Amino acid sequence: MGSDSADTPRRRFGRTDLQVSPFGLGCARIGGIFKQNPNDFVNLLATSFDRGINFFDTADIYSQGESERLLGRTFRRRRDRIVLASKAGFLLPAQRRFLAPLKPLLRPIIGLVGLSRQQVPNVVRGELAQDFSPVHLRRSIEGSLRRLATDHLDLFQLHSPPSAIVQSGDWVETLERMKQEGKIRYYGVSCDDLDSALVALEHPGVSSLQISISLLERRAMAALSPARVRGVAVIAREVLANGALVKKASEVNLRDYCDSDEEAATKGEQLKAYRQQALDRGISLARLALEFVRDLDGVSVTLVGVSRMEQLNALFAEAIPSEELVASSARQTQN
């Protein structure tokens, strides 16, 4: 792929006028306290853009707002060439709000002692609550705009709302008003289950769904056809099954991803079959997994989550060859 992402063909994002890259960057780990310094994140974001990615998905709570700040810092002068999607609906626990301004001091200490995210007690992380009230949504969107250094979001999404909240539609009026004010261009729902996704489709103003789809998790695929009929874009996340489709077989404990031992056993057999399929084709399992989701009819953007340059390099070298990225965009554009 060339050095200018404008050379990369795009897909239409549902019935909107947004044109997006087939792969987007999930920014949940951008700015994390357990990772590198901010300049490295900026370089990572800029490099992903140079390699053809123009869709960036973040949220107000990701890295206590640092994810949005780094996106704003990186793309302030290239705002019209990217698609910014953010989310809101969660409330940061007091512990995390307190730690946020201390990140520059804590990051080198954490790196020195080798502390990982998994080693942090829940009492320090705190429990996330939710708020989808008009006041909170407006305050959150305006906060995101400040951090992203922009006057509008291309896409705003409710962040994992319960089905009852989606069903109520109490949030629609607020988001429609913010569309009229020019603060958001489109809005959608990031869903945790199929039921929420199907309910979201009943609201005519919804322009997108974000759902989990992978070789190992296909339940939400039932939303693809009705979304396509309505012209609703679909953003696929967790396409590598939270790492299960990139880790070595010896490193994967499927029980961590499943509700029961029986489900874990079934997915274990599926995983073995997919490993063999990738081997037979002479490609990595990660590439097989990404191709599967990318080529699903109705998927507009396939999110990949990276937080280090070596991860991005490996992804493009092994799993997203340039010719595949361009060819898949061309196929979608023709459909």
Describe the role of every protein-language-model region.
Residues 27-35, 122, 128-129, 257:
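Acidic/histidine-rich helix-loop elements
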Residues 91-127:
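Alpha-helical membrane-targeting segments
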Residues 2-7, 40, 64, 142, ...:
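Beta/alpha (TIM)-barrel catalytic core signal, keyed to glycine-rich beta->alpha loops juxtaposed to Asp/Glu
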Residues 35-48, 132-148, 191-199:
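Short, acidic/polar
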